[in-house]
Design a protein with these regions (language model features):
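Short Cys/His-rich "knuckle" micro-motifs
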Residues: 181-184, 207-208
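Short linker/helix segments within small regulatory modules
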Residues: 184-192
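Catalytic core of nucleotidyl cyclases, primarily class III adenylyl/guanylyl cyclases
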Residues: 43-65, 79-106
Length: 227
């Protein structure tokens, strides 16, 4: 039998970059940490239903509980050193539960919304906002109408407004959060760049120098053509 539930799909932003840079063991350790954090963020009847890669699917019969869970996730991951930013999608609608699996377009749309959300943000459908009992928990910023693959019609989407108390610093190579810059590796020439390790600094310099060298070659070739 179908019933209405709230769904949150929450992904780690930059997980592929982290895996590529620091390897499978570091990636697996990060997932273990993500699960521990998520377990401590659950509100009310919210529960983790399943994990696929770096995405966790949360479900609740009450949208207010799931929104509170999402806010906890953002707050706890933002302050976690050497972690990744999180992004997610929230939706409310009918699903079919069979052998502890959920089926229906509600699941698909929640996943599609999560895929569009930028790092450090949660986006939600108008159905989710309308289903909230207490809409004063936080503000919602309209992101306009969106089309989603394999979803009929346009959907009005909102961003959950989360007040940022500090500037978010991110390692440009592995995408890890730099919570305490005083303990990170500071780029000697670019003031705004911090790295989790000398490995990432060296990788950045290698890539940057390679791009700079290519640009110089292009400029030289263009100059020869003009002459």
């Amino acid at each position: 039998m179908e019933k209405n539930i709230a769904i949150l799909m929450a992904d780690l932003s930059g997980y592929s970059a982290l895996t590529e840079t620091h390897g499978a063991t570091s990636a697996a350790d990060l997932i273990d940490k993500y699960i521990r954090i998520a377990e401590n963020c659950l509100v009310g009847d919210s529960k983790m239903h399943q994990r696929t890669g770096d995405e966790i699917m949360f479900v609740s019969d009450y949208p207010d509980f799931l929104l509170a869970t999402a806010l906890n996730l953002e707050a706890n991951t933002t302050n976690e050193e050497n972690f990744l930013q999180i992004h997610g999608g929230l939706h409310f609608g009918k699903v079919l539960n069979r052998t502890d699996s959920y089926f229906g377009s509600t699941v698909n749309l929640a996943s599609r919304i999560a895929a569009k959300a930028l790092a450090g943000t949660f986006w939600c459908s108008d159905d989710f906002v309308k289903s909230l009992t207490n809409k004063s928990i936080c503000a919602f910023k309209s992101k306009g109408s969106h089309l989603f693959k394999n979803i009929n019609g346009q959907k009005e989407i909102y961003e959950v407004s989360i007040e940022k108390t500090t500037t978010t610093l991110v390692d440009p190579i592995c995408r890890m959060l730099i919570v305490n810059p005083q303990y990170a590796i500071h780029h000697p020439n670019e003031n705004e760049l911090y790295f989790c390790s000398t490995q990432c600094l060296e990788e950045y310099n290698k890539n940057h120098n390679s791009v700079h060298y290519t640009e110089m070659l292009d400029q030289s070739e263009n100059q020869l053509i003009l002459n």
